[in-house]
Amino acid sequence: MRKNKYLYITLLAVLGFHQEAMAQAIASTPRLVVNITVDQLRTDYLETFMPLYGNDGFKKLLKQGKVFASASYDFTPVDRASAIATIATGTTPYYHGIVGTEWLDRQTLRPVRCTGQNNTPINILTSTLGDEMKLASSGTAQIYAFAPTADAAILSAGHAADGAAWTNLNRWNNIDYYAPVPLWQSDYTKTYAVETDINKSITELALSCIEKSNIGMDETPDLLNVIYKQGATPEESYKNIDQHLSRLILRIERRLGHNNVLFVLTGTGYSEEREEREDEEKFHIPTGKFNIQRTANLLNMYLGAIYGSAKYVEASYKNQLFLNHQLFDQKNINLADVLNRAQEFLLQVEGVRNVYTSNQLLTSESERLEKIRNGFCTEKCGDLIIEIAPGWKLVNEETHESTTQRVNFISFPIIFYGANITAERVLTPVTVDRIAPTIAKAIRIRAPNACASEPLF
């Protein structure tokens, strides 16, 4: 009898401890995740303009947050759309499918936007963090995204959000893909025009969301995505973003409490600074112009000399060449042989540093090719990827575009702040695909379905 009594007391103690631990776990789970992305954020500028900041924006995050000082994207090339999709999905374009803001449609041979003509998230091939939050909460989690552009808003929001909005000249655009636009959002975007200071308008809309939607007010974690843009000059941009960042953080903390909110801030890992006219020849710097259309024509002539006159190269786009698969099938020509011949030919063209074939990227296990493979998607990329020499200009005569090849590393941080996070500066290099699993761990849900990366902490 006494033995049973002791067993009963022990069970009560264990159950009590378990319930207390569960209560503490629920209490420590952030009610709101504020995922802030600063387009083209750079560590050098962030530090250079430190004297211009107030105490509650960048300075607060850098001093009181967990700062991963050396972040990068584990694929190339990186642009706004591919970067934001990677933040949302925790994986690379190889899996999530967003290889860029635009890509060439293989059927029409015309460029298409990553969100399509109707501005929807259907081109994201995997789940996003917001999608997993919806699944984990049986749909009760609230997910919003506000940005300067459609692609940034929609890719952040994911497949199952409650709302997303972006700026278009001096007015707001709402997405009605998910469901009817929430009434508070519809009223706001109809009432308030977008100001010249777009970041201010985005901040105002985000704060209106906090107040009108009751986001973050219950125990189910919600997600608010905010994307800021760069302005005319770096100095103006960083000072401007700091002011709005400060206001956003203070208002949200005042409403929800510091420990109930997890703020995450990072950048998009690339830079689109206007190229100044440089006198390379004067200083004997190796340079030149690589014309992608002329190269496509030369390759077509070369293949014609081997296989007979025909249109073997269907199109060129950026640094990619697209071959006519149907024609090779009709002629019963082995595509792998064609790719190898084309690669050998292109490597002899002046200004070409390297050439990668689709077969090579899909089958090779070389670590050297890993970043290029991670940025590749069979349905949306060319058969031949051309890497031109550093300093050379990639010229497109049809679009009159010209970009200079640079391989400079763009340093930017990942910062976590709030939600009982201890301040720390981590110098170990990390990749952005680890943000999503880190947030998922913090709010105790699964990471997105193509995310194989470990949480940062």
Whereabouts are the PLM-identified features?
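Substrate-binding rim/cap in mid-to-C-terminal beta-strand-loop elements of soluble/periplasmic
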Residues: 292-333, 401-443
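Secreted, luminal/periplasmic, and some membrane-associated catalytic domains
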Residues: 53, 70, 79, 101-118, ...
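Beta-strand elements within well-structured catalytic alpha/beta cores of enzymes
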Residues: 31-42, 61, 87, 133, ...
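Second-shell loop/turn segments in exported
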Residues: 42-48, 73-74, 116-121, 191-196, ...
